[in-house]
Amino acid sequence: MLLRTQLFGKVYEFGSIKELLARANEEKSGDRQAGIAAATVAERMAARHVLAEVPLEVLRWYPVIPYEVDEVTRVIQDGVNETIYNEIKGWTVGEFREWLLADTTAGDMIRRVSNGLTAEMIAAVTKLMSNLDLIYGASKIRCTAHANNTIGLKGTLASRNQPNHPTDSVTGIRATIYEGLSYGSGDSVIGINPMDDSVDSVMRLLEMTYEIIQKWRIPTQNCILAHVTTQMEALRRGAPVGLVFQSLAGSQKANEAFGINVAMLDEAYALAQKYCVSSGPNYMYFETGQGSALSAEAHDGADQLTLEARIYGLAKRYAPFQVNTVVGFIGPEYLYDAVQITRAGLEDHFMGKLTGISMGCDACYTNHARATQNDIENLAVLLTAAGCNYFMGVPMGDDAMLSYQCTSYHDTATLRQLLGLRPLPEFEAWLEDIGLMKDGVLTAKAGDASFFLR
């Protein structure tokens, strides 16, 4: 297929689908660093003009990393529903965009079509969307899942209670969990990034968090975000695991840099289904983020947005309870400033929902990025309007272990009140029962961790 157009008297030609996708991407410092970004705004617009005319089937024919050499590609391609794909393969990317945004296209129609898509199709249509398009398109799609409660229901906004501690102090973590719970944070998960990845330390944190959940009869789940092999061993030893976690990348080589592969994830999923203490049927938790493959020198010339879309295609194999992009965590080398972080957050959320997974966002930034807490609050409002399933909850938005800034316990409570949303229904009923919430609003008892020391 000839990938060529003329714009303002200049001819632009692109050598491959991979190159076209990269040139059509919004400005990202990571793509610029990789040497694959459009040289000018005019070239970017020319690439989008060409991309809009590409049939979806061509994007399936030419994945950014060949089927023969990459197991992520194989997972995505082999998972396509061929009946649905055959119905839509003749659509151009531009026609697909118009269909997604049309008032006559409902969320259940999009959920059905998602089963006939590949990651490259999802990435391509995302590149043709404005920020408002991404918000509106994502708002149509509801992706629910269930562990001990149901996430993703219309009218709800969940929060991960993230009580990280620089030394994994059980006393410090317990106090932080209580503070988060007192603000209504923790309905998606009580999830800890451990400093110590050893099995014994992870088991200690699993037992402590499970004890809190059991003592207070909290309708939620726990998760310790250690390497998946550590969690697998903890499961084998009988630890009370609610969700099994792993960070994912969009290429086989990048996942190998993370110390994982599809066979390992398959084994972890099977163990989770057999031994997790949650009711299920969804037991997995994944985190993602644009730029991870580039940081591992494993991008194979593909742009970071397309590789991110491929992560969601891999995640879908495991019917996860929740997935979130950690959108500004890697730093300004990949997303330079608030403009790029905001764009990537909206892109990732839209692509996750279009893939068909329960999607949240860690709206965050590092201290050397050109971003502030106000920018993260702005992104959180936009994502909430887009129907984001959950955010992180960190004391005052400052993670003392990971040394980055994100959303606070207060932020989710404010977003719920601002936009008329509620916690997950089982969790809200629990908050009401213990006196921390009434009619969807926190009571005077909220915000005081000592409430749980009675």
PLM regions: where:
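Anaerobic metallocofactor- and corrinoid-dependent redox/one-carbon enzyme cores
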Residues: 1-174, 182, 187-454
